[in-house]
Amino acid sequence: MNIDNTSYAEAAMLIRKPISEVFEAFINPEITTKFWFTKASEKLQEGKSIDWVWEMYGNHTVTVKVLSIKANEAIVIQWGDDEKAIAEWEFNDLGDSKTFVTITYNGIQGKQDEMCAQIRDVTEGFTLVLAGLKAYLEHNIQLNLVADRFPVELTED
């Protein structure tokens, strides 16, 4: 991926599970729904457009286009309709059932203050996703980090 060093967000985490298990957690919605979104139209497959739904946010839906999948190495998606909004997962096998996952989001645009807010929000969001993944895969605990970031009680008028 060609990253513009001024307009991307990144989060990374060590997950103490084999790379195949960590990779599967991101392509298989039966697992991903335990730590991120609540529904998906199907499993990630290269060339397909998939709907991800966050029911806790009023059924907020994002359509992602899967640009490439390299088993146990990388996933690249286009996030929504913006062709520049690209998210990439990189999986590194550290041996001894340890996987280092890096998520990079490129395509942040706008004025400087808008870009700073997007970088902050995307970095926070993917950090919560990785922390939720870690808790789920390593300890079989669903922390509900994504849902609890914006509790409905704080958003109701």
PLM regions with names:
Residues 8-10, 59-64, 84-88:
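Short, surface-exposed coil-to-beta transition loops
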Residues 19-20, 67-72, 91-100:
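A short, structured loop/turn motif at beta-sheet edges
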Residues 12-16, 53, 65, 90:
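Generic structural detector for well-ordered beta-strands
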Residues 39-81:
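Glycine-rich portal/gate segments that line the openings of hydrophobic small-molecule binding cavities
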Residues 135-157:
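Short, highly charged C-terminal tails/helix-capping segments
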Residues 81-128, 146:
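Beta-strand/loop substructures that line and gate deep hydrophobic ligand-binding cavities in soluble
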Residues 22-26, 32, 50, 66, ...:
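Hydrophobic pocket/interface hotspot
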